[in-house]
Each structure stands twice: as structure tokens, then as C-alpha cells.
């Protein structure tokens, strides 16, 4: 018998370079009733079909709601005394630092309230979940008992698992350096963090 789907579930999706029709078909294939946009900058120069000025109207035509939750957006700056030095990528380290703030907690609570009402999909730009800050949001949901899955194709979703080097105390997550080295060895090569070059200003992710 197929495994029953958890009653409390959040889906995630990256719009990437998909056409609007492709994106909508993905949402419909997974019964999404509301998109929660977690981009800090809700527009795309190369894919304007996903701009905040037009996407809500397009989704409304097919019965899908839209909410922009900027309080969960990326582009956060790391602190000089960061507890999250396990992330060598400055963008992820900055977001992990932001996860320790009341603003993040309040926005996450809004997300959970939306998930209690609708079948939601967190949306950002990056197609690959583990290259996007929505994977950290999924960590925060997971430690609160909320099952999260990443939409990959119309017929497949990927269950989110906690970041290997995360340290959890209650609902607080940090990513300390001492946990990172051993965790890296357990990951497949394709998911290991690259060694940063001396100039770390270049942002390798399209996640905003």
C-alpha cells in the first residue's frame, strides 16, 4: 500500500527558466493552492513571467493564490561573530544568522499559518533546492515537525532532510564549523561545499 502523505506538509519550488505554462503545470501536478514567494527581490530580468507585477494575476486565472513573504527572503549579511561558520558560502551563513532573529521567527510563523490553511509551495528562483536559501527555511520547518518536500518534476518530489552539519536545540538551528568537516565526508561529492577562493564576494547562487 502507498504511504499516506503527512497532513502537515510544505512544498518548495524554484521557478528557474521555466515557462509560465510549465510552472503552472508543476503546481497543478502537486495540487498546490497557494504560492508563497520568498524572494527578497520578486522579479527576474530574464524571466519576467515571474515578476510580482504579473505572476499573481497569472496564478489567479488558474485558481492558485499568491503571497509575497519578504521576511523570509535571502540576501542577508553574515555577522562578524557568526555562529554559523560551518557554511563557507557567505550567503548561506548570512541567512543562517538571520534565522536567529525575531523577524525570521515572525515570518516563519506567518508561513506556518498559511500552510495550515492551504497547500502551499515556497517559491524562489534557484531550481536546485540545496543551492537555495529555501533549504534553510525547510530546516526550520522540519525541527518544528513540519514535513517539507521539494517539487522536482510533475511526477516526483524530494523529501527534505536536515542539513547534515546542523546543530539543533529545540527549534533553534545553528551550523557550527566543528560539525561541518565530518558531515562533508558523508555527503556525495556533488553536494559538498566548494572551497572558497580568496575573493568570496562573487555570489554563486541565483537565489534571492
Regions found by a protein language model. Give the residues of each.
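Residues lining hydrophobic/aromatic ligand-binding pockets adjacent to catalytic sites
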Residues: 1-208
Amino acid at each position: 500500500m502507498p504511504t499516506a502523505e503527512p497532513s502537515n506538509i510544505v512544498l518548495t519550488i524554484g521557478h528557474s527558466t521555466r515557462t509560465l505554462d510549465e510552472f503552472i503545470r508543476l503546481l497543478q501536478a502537486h495540487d498546490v493552492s497557494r504560492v508563497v514567494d520568498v524572494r527578497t527581490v520578486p522579479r527576474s530580468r530574464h524571466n519576467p513571467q515571474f515578476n510580482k507585477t504579473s505572476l499573481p494575476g497569472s496564478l489567479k486565472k488558474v485558481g492558485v493564490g499568491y503571497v509575497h513573504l519578504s521576511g523570509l527572503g535571502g540576501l542577508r549579511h553574515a555577522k562578524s561573530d557568526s555562529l554559523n561558520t560551518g557554511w563557507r558560502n557567505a550567503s548561506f551563513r548570512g541567512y543562517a544568522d538571520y534565522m536567529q532573529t525575531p523577524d525570521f521567527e515572525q515570518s516563519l510563523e506567518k508561513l506556518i499559518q498559511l500552510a495550515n490553511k492551504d497547500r502551499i509551495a515556497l517559491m524562489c528562483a534557484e531550481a536546485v533546492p540545496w543551492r537555495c536559501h529555501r533549504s534553510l527555511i525547510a530546516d526550520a520547518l522540519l525541527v518544528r515537525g513540519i514535513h517539507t518536500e521539494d517539487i522536482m518534476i510533475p511526477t516526483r518530489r524530494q523529501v527534505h532532510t536536515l542539513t547534515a552539519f546542523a546543530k539543533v536545540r529545540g527549534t533553534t538551528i545553528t551550523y557550527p564549523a566543528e560539525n561541518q568537516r565530518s558531515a562533508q565526508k558523508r555527503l556525495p561529492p556533488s553536494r559538498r561545499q566548494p572551497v572558497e577562493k580568496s575573493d568570496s564576494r562573487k555570489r554563486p547562487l541565483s537565489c534571492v
